[in-house]
Amino acid sequence: MQSSSPSQNHSTQVPIKVTHRQVKKRAIRRRRVDLVCGCSYYLHINCFNHGFTHRGSHHCSSSNEWRVYLGNKQSPVFHNHQAPTTTIPAEPGHHNSPGSIQSQPEEGAGDSQMFSQLPDLDNLTASDWSFLKGL
């Protein structure tokens, strides 16, 4: 049966497997961010306004930390790192002092706070156990 279209050049759809294979081979778009301490990290190009603390300093992935890489000696990799003039203040309620170590509570053999209100576990029925296992 002949096509009713006057055009002889019909495009065929690319199979989805071929498309997926091409996308997987594509380089992940990410940016390199150099920190004052000399460390660097890579950030996905669509990820922004997320922060973290590293060596006692809070870092936010905002546009202030991006650097343009020009290659050779123009690249910031070859420049001396200087401390930033402005810092992001720590949010209230967070304890970000670099020298403090938070102690962990000691383990004990007593009742935990979560299970102190439960009745004796020997009194649980089979339906109670099946309900708990389903959680």
From Swiss-Prot:
Q: Which residues form the signal peptide?
A: none
Question: Which intervals of the chain are annotated as region Disordered?
Answer: 77-117
Q: Which GO terms describe its biological process?
A: symbiont-mediated suppression of host innate immune response
Where is motif Nuclear localization signal found?
17-32
Q: Which GO terms describe its cellular component?
A: host cell cytoplasm; host cell nucleus; viral capsid
Alphabetical UniProt keywords = Activator, DNA-binding, Host cytoplasm, Host nucleus, Host-virus interaction, Inhibition of host innate immune response by virus, Metal-binding, Phosphoprotein, Suppressor of RNA silencing, Viral immunoevasion, Zinc, Zinc-finger
**Localisation:** Host nucleus; Host cytoplasm
Zn finger intervals (unnamed): 37-54
Mind telling me how this protein is modified after translation? Phosphorylated.
Q: Where is the composition biased (Polar residues)?
A: 77-88
Which molecular function term from Gene Ontology is one that the record holds?
A: structural molecule activity
Primary location: host cell
Q: Where are the transmembrane segments?
A: none
- UniProt-annotated stretches for the region Transactivation: 120-135
The record's comment about this protein's domains reads:
The zinc finger and the transactivation region are involved in PTGS suppression.
Member of which family? Belongs to the geminiviridae transcriptional activator protein family.
> Any idea what job this protein has?
Strong activator of the late viral genes promoters. Enhances the expression of the capsid protein and nuclear shuttle protein. Acts as a suppressor of RNA-mediated gene silencing, also known as post-transcriptional gene silencing (PTGS), a mechanism of plant viral defense that limits the accumulation of viral RNAs. Suppresses the host RNA silencing by inhibiting adenosine kinase 2 (ADK2), a kinase involved in a general methylation pathway.
Oligomeric state and interaction partners are given as: Monomer. Homodimer. Homooligomer. Self-interaction correlates with nuclear localization and efficient activation of transcription. Monomers suppress local silencing by interacting with and inactivating host adenosine kinase 2 (ADK2) in the cytoplasm. Interacts with and inhibits host SNF1 kinase. Binds to ssDNA.
Q: What is the protein's name according to its record?
A: Transcriptional activator protein
Q: To which species is this protein native?
A: African cassava mosaic virus (isolate West Kenyan 844)
